[in-house]
């Protein structure tokens, strides 16, 4: 399948990175190489390292970055330290993470990310490890509820989990539309009528669980920040409130001076900030981009500079 990709908040990311043509940069989520290509085009003696755990994305990015000062590596961005060590790169001058599911993964029904087309219930970005079907057919009601509530902020998590457990006693839940119909059937009729995509939150939750996305984000942010050179910029695009909250909290913690417990009345840590916030509030797409690229609707960009 053709790997189509319109990079989200592209000009804002390029501005946020403040690219040095001689610098070393990391794109931790290569996808269709939309951001990577524009970063690499701005380098002269510099170098770009693009990572992606999806083998389809790696092949596409490698082809699209051919002839540019860029190298593509199949890895999750949580593995940044290992990759940079293997490439003998001690520090980088900037990094970008675009945390959205790529258009290719959504458009390729066989990957099992979409609730609009019937396909095997997969959702693995790396195409390795347990699938979404493995999770929904084996986890108990309590754990399913936790996943749907914590990762999807789904108000009907307990009811949906109950429907899943009951349904799989008769037949395994193996396809995306089978799962989507089951989710909708657990909701009150009024909720189904007002909610255009009743399966959206649950699909998000299961996808996050299958891919360990929030753990990867936490580990990846720490790994990348530790390799940023002073003055290096870190840009992260999020697409839902869970990710944005994590990024916001992490950035603020790096930018704050005092790290004493909030209940302690007097500072004793003598702490100095490790970074400064370039964006106090997240940057969102303007009207023109929203019209051109629907995927940008929920995108939020935060930018940090290491001190």
Give the positions of each predicted feature.
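S-adenosyl-L-methionine-dependent methyltransferase catalytic core, i.e., the SAM/SAH-binding region
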Residues: 1-307
């Amino acid at each position: 399948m053709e790997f189509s990709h319109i990079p989200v908040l592209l000009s804002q990311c390029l501005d946020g990175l403040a690219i040095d043509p001689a610098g070393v940069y990391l794109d931790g989520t290569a996808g269709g190489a939309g951001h990577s290509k524009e970063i690499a085009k701005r380098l002269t003696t510099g170098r770009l390292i693009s990572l992606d755990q999806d083998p389809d994305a790696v092949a596409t990015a490698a082809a699209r970055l051919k002839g540019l000062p860029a190298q593509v590596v199949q890895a999750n961005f949580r593995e940044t330290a290992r990759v940079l060590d293997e490439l003998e790169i001690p520090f980088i001058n900037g990094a970008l993470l675009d945390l959205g599911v790529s258009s290719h993964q959504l458009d390729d029904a066989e990957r099992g990310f979409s609730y609009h087309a019937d396909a095997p219930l997969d959702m693995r970005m790396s195409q390795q490890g347990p699938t979404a079907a493995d999770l929904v057919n084996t986890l108990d009601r309590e754990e399913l509820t936790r996943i749907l509530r914590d990762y999807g902020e789904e108000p009907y998590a307990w009811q949906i989990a109950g429907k899943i457990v009951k349904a799989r006693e008769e037949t395994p839940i193996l396809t995306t539309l089978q799962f989507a119909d089951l989710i909708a059937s657990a909701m009150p009729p009024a909720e189904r009528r007002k909610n255009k995509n009743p399966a959206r939150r649950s699909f998000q939750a299961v996808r996050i669980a299958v891919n360990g996305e929030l753990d990867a984000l936490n580990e990846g942010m720490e790994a990348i920040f530790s390799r940023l050179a002073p003055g290096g910029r870190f840009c992260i695009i999020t697409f839902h409130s869970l990710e944005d909250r994590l990024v916001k909290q992490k950035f603020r913690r790096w930018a704050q001076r005092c790290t004493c417990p909030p209940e302690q009345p007097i500072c004793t840590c003598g702490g100095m900030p490790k970074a400064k916030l370039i964006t106090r509030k997240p940057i969102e797409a303007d009207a023109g981009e929203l019209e051109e690229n629907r995927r940008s609707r929920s995108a939020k960009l935060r930018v940090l500079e290491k001190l």
